[in-house]
Amino acid sequence: MKKIILIAYALTCTASLYAGHSKELKLTSPEGVHEVMFRQEKISSSVNEIVYQVKYRGREVIGNSRAGLQLDNRTWELALARKINQVKCWMDNLEVDSVIYQPAVNKSWHPLYGERSTVREAYNEAIMYLSKKDGSNYRLNIEVRAYDEGIAFRYFFPEHP
């Protein structure tokens, strides 16, 4: 019996060690209405991209779609004399460093005016940490929230070292 408990404990510890090192972010709303997934996908031998997908009640409503930003850093990088290989989309070749799942949120707040005196705010949240491995040290976080009413995500650029 002690052996079984010890093995179960070891497996739990091992799983928790690798939980933050997944290359995929998969999040479901509190009631399971919406599901969103972000992952890294290799599209050629030299290019990978971040794609996302959204499901509503188990049905796919947004198929694999490319997450992207149109940024033109060439002038800045030339001024800094950086030798960086330019890619078609700024988000190409971002590598997933880790995915961190935040504790579920379930709280209420009171608006100053409106139809309701109390508004419930319930969601699950995760953050995907990405970085460029081309010598630029650029980083990007994708912060994702899954509400029962819908999905929200934003791009966050941490301060550049």
Regions found by a protein language model. Give the residues of each.
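Boundary at the C-terminal end of the N-terminal hydrophobic targeting segment
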Residues: L17-S22
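N-terminal accessory beta-strand-rich subdomains and adjacent acidic, glycine-rich linkers
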Residues: E24-P161
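Sec-dependent N-terminal signal peptides
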Residues: I4-C13
